[in-house]
């Protein structure tokens, strides 16, 4: 998983979230994100009444191909060896990566400063706005030092 802000920036530049994710794909990702430990296909299928093992296995193949999940380990399920799976990024990192991909599509029409202004303008609590501005200022100072 991506650890710090610099790793996140590099990760988001290199990894594009596929546009063809379905509701089922997201269902399985959500199950994996909510789990404290890696899950087998049968554990994933049993955690949602609407999922069959065949659907889960098909989605797992797709998510593995897209590198959104990985095989964590080989474990016993009863007397049978099974693969256990875990996500390759956190739910927050996934959301940020999606946002980054969407922003790239509109960045010629909406500048970063306009976007930040709109986000700050949508917040009603002045204390939260002040805190956000302080965090943004620290980030900008960090970027200036790197230039």
What are the residue ranges of the model-derived segments?
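Short alpha-helical segments that sit at the start of domains
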Residues: 2-27, 139-142, 146
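Short, cationic-aromatic polyanion-contact patches
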Residues: 13, 17-24, 40, 74-96
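Basic amphipathic alpha-helical segments that dock to polyanions
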Residues: 28, 58-66
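Short helix-capping/hinge SLiMs at alpha-helix to coil transitions
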Residues: 33-36
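Short acidic, hydrophobic short linear motifs in intrinsically disordered regions
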Residues: 38-47
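Short coil turns linking two alpha-helices in DNA-binding domains
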Residues: 51-52, 56
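A short, conserved structural fragment
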Residues: 64-76
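Amphipathic alpha-helical dimerization/coiled-coil segments
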Residues: 93-144
């Amino acid at each position: 998983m991506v650890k710090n802000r610099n790793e996140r920036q590099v990760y988001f530049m290199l990894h594009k979230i596929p546009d063809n994710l379905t509701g089922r794909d997201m269902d399985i990702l959500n199950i994996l994100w909510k789990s404290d430990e890696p899950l087998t296909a049968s554990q994933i299928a049993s955690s949602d009444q609407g999922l069959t093992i065949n659907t889960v296995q098909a989605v797992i193949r797709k998510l593995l191909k897209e590198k959104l999940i990985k095989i964590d380990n080989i474990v016993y399920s009863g007397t049978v060896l099974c693969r256990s799976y875990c996500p390759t990024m956190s739910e927050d990192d996934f959301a940020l990566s999606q946002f980054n991909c969407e922003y790239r599509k509109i960045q010629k029409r909406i500048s970063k400063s306009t976007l930040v202004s709109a986000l700050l303008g949508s917040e009603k609590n002045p204390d939260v706005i002040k805190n956000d501005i302080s965090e943004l200022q620290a980030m900008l100072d960090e970027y200036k030092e790197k230039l």
